[in-house]
A protein has these predicted regions:
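Short, well-structured N-terminal submotif of metal-dependent ribonuclease cores
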Residues: 1-38, 50-64, 132-135, 146
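Acidic catalytic patch
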Residues: 16, 37-44, 66-98
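Amphipathic coiled-coil/heptad-repeat helices and related helical stalk/stem segments
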Residues: 24, 105-106
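A generic structural signal for well-ordered alpha-helical segments
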Residues: 31, 72-73, 113
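Acidic, PIN/NYN-like endoribonuclease modules and their adjacent C-terminal/linker elements
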Residues: 86-99, 110-146
Length: 146
């Protein structure tokens, strides 16, 4: 099953000084042949975080972050997933599971993965609580860290 990499996992893969860089690389090396995806939201988030000096000590300019993103998505087995999810429509999102503003983007990225018949790969265990029925977290969320 193709895995949609969330922003945190993309950042961990790209930045050698990230605390989970080795773990992310190990997971990626073992799993990328099954296919891996990005979407508009994860690509934009990657550029935003990669060019934010408050988040990353070696942040780059947006232009440099875009160049890095292009190199990453140029790696083998990548697919780009369109995002046609309307959060207002409620497709693939169980609003009863949303309890805070920080869950909105996670739920949206999870919804994109479900729309495309895939799963989400993340460093964030909290995403498992957002999985809507009839799916199971074990089926559609891959938490890369132990």
């Amino acid at each position: 099953m193709i895995a949609l990499l969330d922003v945190n996992l993309l950042i961990a893969l790209a930045w050698p000084n990230h605390v989970h860089h080795r773990t992310a690389l190990h997971w990626f090396d073992r799993n990328r042949k099954s296919g891996w995806a990005t979407c508009p939201l994860t690509q934009s988030g990657f550029v935003r975080v990669s060019s934010n000096a408050h988040t990353l000590p070696d942040a780059r300019s947006p232009r440099e972050a875009l160049a890095l993103l292009r190199r990453i998505v140029g790696l083998p087995d990548h697919v780009f997933w369109q995002d046609d999810i309307s959060i207002a429509a409620g497709d693939f999102i169980d609003e009863k599971k949303l309890h805070g503003h920080r869950q909105i983007t996670d739920a949206h990225v999870l919804a994109v993965a479900l729309r495309h018949g895939g799963r989400i790969a993340t460093l964030d265990r909290g995403i498992t609580h957002l999985v809507p029925a009839p799916h199971s977290a074990k089926e559609v969320v891959c938490v890369v860290i132990d």
